[in-house]
């Protein structure tokens, strides 16, 4: 039995163990104190203070990375919550599109910085591009963005070539015809004028960026934007599906303005998301054609990117079932999945509408030429023949035609709503053909002479206007939609000398002046949807449903055309008045809205940013302040949605499909 436990036993170290422990302690002390002399000198200078300042400046981001800065922030007072929303949406878009937004594929075309070069070239007048001896290759891939670069000529070209060696891709692009972005274009006070024009052009470009970025933030991939409520909007013409109408409609405007990043975003969305397959959408044949088919065709002409040709054909094929009628006159609406087509119930007993079935020719004819498929041209030629052969009351075309019987509906004639763009496409089909489609020009002249005789009138105050004709009775009202006709008459005068030339130009100038008057007689300096003429009032809306303005472009279209044809400075001045009015009354923090009453000092906004505001309104204003060599009117013809299409025989960007010759059996 143990009296003392083992734990209480006293232990003794041997001398060898004591020496070993002491040696370890000495070594530790040497390492601790000696290491101080090996440290860098952080105390003999202000390094510690500088490190502290770096940490203080870093803020919380050193632990939580800050979100990326917004690329476009013109309004520094913007609510930080909205900035956060924008950043979250950017992340959503990037997740959807992958890394294409940051680094476009190599096939995506152009050398780095190409669009910056374009912006610099836009500041000075550029020469009209000379056509190449041979047309461009039909499909350029998606590498043809540099077509917007202005060619460098003469000594400047030599000096630039010596100081900036070019890649083979750049040399290839310079060998091809160019579509230059021009600048001023007036011999008077060029330095001052060019600076003013550049300022105005850049302002319109900034408006486009504002409209696009807010659409991207709040309605990306949807059809249109509601800026006030910051959510998507979709009109019935697009069905109930998300077709990216603003993307497709506005993309060529981005391209013309040289907005590369935004253009890439739109193109990538079209490639990845745009399709009419597997959706049961009831679409307007007319609206789908002028916006989607027309927009894709323009982008194909600009770039040679086969994506756009394929998409244009894809959309057109979805519209073809609407043409299956006894007369070949298409219905207004078609279901893209079932092919079932119909007309609007309100349209004069199930009739088709003149301005709709008569506004397909430019797109379908060009689509046949670039695909080699004659079907599309055949469809619109059938429409042409029906309208040519049918009896026309007093030489005029009523707005309604029954597609089953081939008989006119109500005898209502208009150069505004329901009729307008049919007459436009008669002249422009002739222009698009290189002035070889004489049938179209003859039909245009016959129609215009009847309109001049039966519908064009002059008010007591000397204002020229186009009235509506209903059952042989004039309605002294002019639609805003009819304001395009000022440019139409002028273009008809400028492209052929005949007995009507002077009258066409006189009426074109008069109508454009009248539409300007409808703007400046409103407190907002923006024109109403329709305006009337009587002994008591001229160029003013009287009914509440006529007093709104929905960002329409027709008046600015005529300013643009008249400027190009006359170089009368007043058209540019009028255009700038419109820019200021749009900025004052239609701009919001999140886009642009129409107005419910242009006669109120502080009008209520309608909360819709129309896709045509980007496609037409801003494009025409931008071109109004650009050089004539930017989309010259003798090389390009604009469809009714302002999508420019090349003129055959005058423009190397026509990109007609090669003709396949029959194989000979001869040995």
Curated annotation (Swiss-Prot):
Residue ranges, compositional bias (Low complexity): 156-178
Pfam assignment, any one: Glyco_hydro_47
Intracellular or extracellular location(s): Golgi apparatus membrane
Membrane topology: Single-pass type II membrane protein
Residue positions binding Ca(2+): 640
Enzymatic class: hydrolase
Expression sites (tissue/organ): Complex spatial distribution during embryogenesis, including expression in lobula plate giant neurons. Also expressed in adult wing and eyes.
Regions of this protein lying in the Cytoplasmic compartment: 1-18
Residues glycosylated per entry: 278
Residue numbers on the Lumenal membrane side: 40-667
Cofactor: Ca(2+); Mg(2+)
The keyword Nucleus is annotated on this UniProt entry: no
Keyword set includes Calcium: yes
EC number, UniProt record: 3.2.1.113
Active site residues per record: 529
Record field: catalytic activity: N(4)-(alpha-D-Man-(1->2)-alpha-D-Man-(1->2)-alpha-D-Man-(1->3)-[alpha-D-Man-(1->2)-alpha-D-Man-(1->3)-[alpha-D-Man-(1->2)-alpha-D-Man-(1->6)]-alpha-D-Man-(1->6)]-beta-D-Man-(1->4)-beta-D-GlcNAc-(1->4)-beta-D-GlcNAc)-L-asparaginyl-[protein] (N-glucan mannose isomer 9A1,2,3B1,2,3) + 4 H2O = N(4)-(alpha-D-Man-(1->3)-[alpha-D-Man-(1->3)-[alpha-D-Man-(1->6)]-alpha-D-Man-(1->6)]-beta-D-Man-(1->4)-beta-D-GlcNAc-(1->4)-beta-D-GlcNAc)-L-asparaginyl-[protein] (N-glucan mannose isomer 5A1,2) + 4 beta-D-mannose; N(4)-(alpha-D-Man-(1->2)-alpha-D-Man-(1->2)-alpha-D-Man-(1->3)-[alpha-D-Man-(1->3)-[alpha-D-Man-(1->2)-alpha-D-Man-(1->6)]-alpha-D-Man-(1->6)]-beta-D-Man-(1->4)-beta-D-GlcNAc-(1->4)-beta-D-GlcNAc)-L-asparaginyl-[protein] (N-glucan mannose isomer 8A1,2,3B1,3) + 3 H2O = N(4)-(alpha-D-Man-(1->3)-[alpha-D-Man-(1->3)-[alpha-D-Man-(1->6)]-alpha-D-Man-(1->6)]-beta-D-Man-(1->4)-beta-D-GlcNAc-(1->4)-beta-D-GlcNAc)-L-asparaginyl-[protein] (N-glucan mannose isomer 5A1,2) + 3 beta-D-mannose
Entry keyword set: Calcium, Disulfide bond, Glycoprotein, Glycosidase, Golgi apparatus, Hydrolase, Membrane, Metal-binding, Signal-anchor, Transmembrane, Transmembrane helix
Pathway(s) served: Protein modification; protein glycosylation
PANTHER family from the UniProt entry: MANNOSYL-OLIGOSACCHARIDE ALPHA-1,2-MANNOSIDASE IA-RELATED, MANNOSYL-OLIGOSACCHARIDE ALPHA-1,2-MANNOSIDASE-RELATED
Protein name (database record): Mannosyl-oligosaccharide alpha-1,2-mannosidase IA
UniProt source species: Drosophila melanogaster (Fruit fly)
